[in-house]
Amino acid sequence: MNLSELIFKRLSADENLQTMLATYAGAPAIFDSEFPADQQEGWEGATQYPRICYRIDMQVNQERSSAGTLYVAMYTDKTSTIIEDIETAVKHCLQDVLMKPAGEAPFCVAWARTESYAIEGKEVWCKEMAFDILEYSEQFSTDPDPVLAVAAYIKKIFPETIVLGIDNVGDFVETSKTPVFYCRLAHLAHTTGHCMNTISWFIGKIAVHLIY
């Protein structure tokens, strides 16, 4: 599954959201990027609110050190007061979880902001949450590899944790239950040493992140 499919799976499997959202084709009303038309048979003539629409923008934000942004918009009619509960459920569902798309680096999301507004011409409220998408790309490079050495050492002393690059990761890891370590090369520079006519010396700084 790709990242969008993982997010859909995570949201649609949440029991709290299942009880609060409208249904479409027998499933919670959660959609990627756009809603089906109001006349679609999947609504089965029932209410179309509350519902959720999410989208992913994989544009790097260097200022926030993020690989992109996840937007989750929640819609309810103006007579409903459930939107706050839906917001809480979405946050709880997406926070403290590592997601591993097939063939890609693992990702986490971190809540950044929430904006509220009314839909013009409709009796509908919307709350849109923005999450920073944090990517944990593989950092291994040379042989012998200092990043791999640090990662292997951490796994040795904390075998109950997951160390990215050492352990195989499934679709989801709930980091509140299983802490995750991520090692990366933060800095690398030439330095001096003996036998410099035959040996190149480097000094490096390795950053260790604990995701929990």
Kindly label every feature range from the protein language model:
Residues 69-72, 88, 143-149, 199-201:
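Short intrinsically disordered coil segments
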Residues 65-78, 124-136, 200-212:
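Oligomerization/assembly interface segments of phage tail-like spikes and tubes
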Residues 43, 61, 120, 197-199:
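Residues embedded in well-ordered secondary-structure elements
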